Amino acid sequence: MSRVTFRSAPGPGAAPHVPPGLESAIDATATSAAVELFAAYRVTIAPVTGPELQLPIPDLSALGIVRFTAPGLIGTTVLGVSTGTLRRSNMRGTSDRDWVAELANQYIGRFKLKLLRMGFELWSMTPVTVSGRLLATAVSQPDFAPIAFRDAKGGSVAVWIEIDIDGPLKVTPPASDGEIPREGDVILF
């Protein structure tokens, strides 16, 4: 079962059509992008599923929100992080709000690059942040459970991805490995 939410765009129309394999690929990509992002900052997180997942996730201190688009879809990614996990990953000592925005930006970058390597291209917008306490009720919907993680010290990370399909999705043959930058590469243009 996918933890990424796919739905039809508001208005009349058919149910969302996602090409075979793309839904599970997006779900796996969403999970691996989070694990790899926090590993880059020496914080190990592991997925939480089934009865271990408690909603709402009680200790999220800040959320970074990023909108993204592609032909045929519009989506939102929300990255929520507990105070302890957020601060353990922040080696530069910036504010929690700035750091969760940076993590959300890096998360969507990793997510996009992984999908691009599979032939699916997304464009993202600048992240915004919100205090976790402001969204406690909005993110506790039982039918909108996050991709949830715990770190070794009990901290939490949660990722919600919602995708509205409003037309045919375009998946192209993947570019060659050398054409797509790796996570963390510096790109000058």
Q: Model segments located where?
A:
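N-terminal auxiliary interaction/assembly segments of multi-subunit proteins
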Residues: M1-F189
